[in-house]
From Swiss-Prot:
Compartments in which it is found: Vacuole membrane
Function recorded in the entry: Vacuolar effluxer which mediate the efflux of amino acids resulting from autophagic degradation. The release of autophagic amino acids allows the maintenance of protein synthesis and viability during nitrogen starvation.
Family: Belongs to the ATG22 family.
One Pfam family of this chain: ATG22
Organism: Cryptococcus neoformans var. neoformans serotype D (strain B-3501A)
Taxonomic classification: Eukaryota, Fungi, Dikarya, Basidiomycota, Agaricomycotina
Chain's gene name: ATG22
Membrane topology type: Multi-pass membrane protein
Name by which UniProt lists this protein: Autophagy-related protein 22
Disulfide bridges in this chain: none
Amino acid sequence: MPPPHVRAWYSYAFAAEVFSSYPSGNIPANHFGTCDGKALQSSDPRGMDRYSFVQSSSMYVKSIAVACQAICIISIGPLADIAYWRKRLLLTFAYSGSLSGILFLLFPPLPYAWTPIMAAILNIVGNATYSTSIVCSNAFLPGLAKEDVDVQKAWEEATSEGLQDGLRDVHEDTDEENTGSVSREDEATHLLPDRLIPAVCAISTQDLALSDPLAKLIEPSNAKKHYESRLSLTTSRLSSTGTAIGFFSGVSVLTLLLIPVTALGGSTFSMRLAIGLSGVWWALFTVPTCIGLPGGAPGHGSDFSASQVKKAWVKIGKMVAPKQIHQLPNLYIFLLAWIFLSDGFHTTTYAAILYASSVLSMSAPKIILVGILVQLAAVVSSVLVPRVQRRLSTTSSKPVTNYKVLLAGVVAAAFIPVYTCAGLVLPFGGLRSEGEMYVLAVWFGLVFGPFLSYSRAVYAELIPPGHESTFFSLFAFTDKSASFIGPAAVGLISDLTGNIRYGFLFLLVMLVVPIPVLGRVAVERGRREAVEWAERSRKEMSDERV
C-alpha cells in the first residue's frame, strides 16, 4: 500500500484524467447547429452556411483554449513552486474545472442564443484549468519521491559519507532560494517550477534515452550518485504509476459513459450528461487529494506579487536568445520541428473528431469509441515499440536508434492526412465510411503513443548534462503552447471552403514540412554540442564566483 501522501496524489490522476479523456470539443458546435444532436439539413442553403460555421466553431474554441492554457501554465509557474500556494492552486483549478463540466447539466433542452457562447466559455475554462491543475499536481512529485523509504535510506548512506553539503540542494524540499551549486543564471531560465521538471522527464523519457543502443549508461560510483539515481528512479516509478492510473480511469469511465450516451440516442443532452458526470467524477475524487496532500504553512514567498508572474514571462526570452540557438543548433532545430509536429498531431485529433461528427455523421457513442480505440492503441504501441526496437538492435548489425523510430513514426502519421485528402480526387476511399475512421483511429493511436515518448527521448539526448530542468521546461512549454495555430487554421479553411476535408491539406503540410527539418538533426553531433555547452557554462560559473 502506498504512503498516504502518494495515495492522495494518485487520487488526483484518477479524478482529472476522466474529464480530459471525453471528446468534449464538439459540444459547442452541436449547440450552434442542432436542437436534438442531429446535424442541420444540407438542403437549406442558409443552413449550409451555418453548417460550415458549425464545423469550424469548435476548432476556434479549441485554439483559444490551448492559448489560454499556455498563458496560465507560464503565469502560475512561480506560485506552483511555493508550498503554500501549490495545494491551494491545485484545488482552485480542480474545482473550477469540474464546475465547468457540471454546469453543462444546467443547459436548457433547446438551444438559445447564449448557449453556444456559454458552451465555448465552459470548454475553454475546463481545458485551461485542467492543464494548470496538472502543473500543480506534478509539482508535488519530487517531494513525494523524497519521502520514499529507499530514497531516505540512500540519503542516510550519502550523509554518512560526509556528502550532505553537496546533496542539501537535491534533497531538501524548501521554497527558499538555494545557495548551493546551482547558478542563479541557470535558475533564471526555468520556464516551469523546478518540482515539475522530474515529472516531465520521468514518464519513460530518461529510460528511453538511456536505452538507446548508441547511448552509454553510467552506473553510480558513490553514495551521492546512488542517491540521485534512486531519487530519479523513484520519481519515474511514481510518475509512470500515476499516468497508468489516469489512463485506466479515463478509458474505464469513457467506456461506462457509452451506456447513457447510447441509451439516449447520442443526443446533445446525452453528451452534456457525459461531460457533467465527468465533472462530478473530477470533483468527487479530488476530495482524497484535498485531505491527503500536504499543504504549506504561510511563510517565505507566500505573499503574492505581480512581479512573480512577470518574472515567469521574462524567463521565456532568455531561453530563445540567439546565443543559445547558435551554441546548440541541433537542439533548437529539433525544437523547431517539434513545434510543428506537436501542433499537427494534436490538431489531427481535434479535426478527426469534428470530421467524424460533421462529415461521417457518426453518433456520439461511436465518437467515444473512436477515442477509446486511440487510447488503447497508444498504450499498446508505447509498450511494444521499445521492445521491438531492442530486439531489432540486438539482431541487426546497425542499431535502431530512438531517432530512427521517431522519424519512422512521423512518416507513418503523415499517411492519415494523405489518405483523407485522397478523397478530394478519388471517387472511392479517402475516409468516406465509419469503418475507415475506426481503422485510422487505431493507426493514429499506434503512432501517437511512441511519438510522444520518443520525442522526449531524442530531446533528452540533446540536452546539456546537468541542465535537464532548464531545457525540459522549454520542451514542456512548447508542447503545451504550440497547438493553438493548427485548430484555428483548420477552422478558417473549413469556413472559407465549406469542407473540413480541405483542412487535412493543412495538416499534411504540418506533418510533412518538419520531416526534412527533423532529418537535419544530427544526434551524435548534438550530444557533443551539449557536453561542450555544459562545460563552457560550468567554466563561466566558476569564473563568476572567483
